[in-house]
């Protein structure tokens, strides 16, 4: 009887070990998924700050069978976004022209001090 009892205890411990491993694995998978989601949100946020359309970013990162050929369009170069920005921010009107004129006026000097553009 003692043999059966020890066998029973051994099986019980083995079962508990399997259950414990399963719970640890489940917890590990949850943490991995959470880290992945946080990483995706961070990446989408970074791309959004760079001026990419958040919806396009989401489609590209998460993936969508309906739109497999989605390409990111930079919102800063999107004429409709630029026009809307100019309407709501009058102070920014002509900013591209100002930047272009600034770039044109910048002189580049070589080591001998001669300017060249």
UniProtKB/Swiss-Prot annotation:
Highest rank taxon of the organism: Viruses
Listed Pfam families: VP2_lagovir
Signal peptide interval: none
UniProt subcellular location: Virion; Host cytoplasm
Main localization of the protein described in the UniProt heading: virion
Disulfide-bonded cysteines: none
InterPro entries in alphabetical order: VP2_lagovirus
Keywords carried by this UniProt record: Capsid decoration protein, Capsid protein, Host cytoplasm, Virion
GO cellular component: host cell cytoplasm; viral capsid, decoration
Entry domain remark: The N-terminus domain points away from the virion surface.
Further comment found in the protein's record: Translated by a ribosomal termination-reinitiation process from the bicistronic mRNA coding for VP1 and VP2.
General function of this protein: Minor structural protein that forms a portal-like structure at a unique three-fold axis of symmetry, following binding to the host receptor. The channel formed by VP2 may allow the delivery of the viral genome through the host endosomal membrane.
Subunit structure: Homooligomer. The portal-like structure consists in 12 copies of VP2. Interacts with capsid protein VP1.
Sequence similarity: Belongs to the lagovirus VP2 protein family.
Protein name stated in the entry: Minor capsid protein VP2
Species: Rabbit hemorrhagic disease virus (strain AST89) (Ra/LV/RHDV/AST89/1989/SP)
């Amino acid at each position: 009887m003692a043999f059966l009892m020890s066998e029973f205890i051994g099986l019980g411990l083995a079962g508990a070990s399997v259950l414990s491993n399963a719970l640890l694995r489940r917890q590990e998978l949850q943490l991995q998924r959470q880290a992945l989601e946080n990483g995706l949100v961070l990446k989408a946020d970074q791309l959004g700050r760079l001026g990419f359309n958040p919806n396009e970013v989401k489609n590209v990162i998460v993936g969508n069978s309906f739109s497999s050929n989605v390409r990111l369009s930079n919102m800063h170069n999107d004429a409709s976004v630029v026009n809307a920005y100019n309407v709501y921010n009058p102070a920014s009107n002509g900013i591209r022209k100002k930047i272009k004129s600034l770039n044109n006026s910048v002189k580049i000097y070589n080591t001998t001090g001669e300017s060249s553009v």
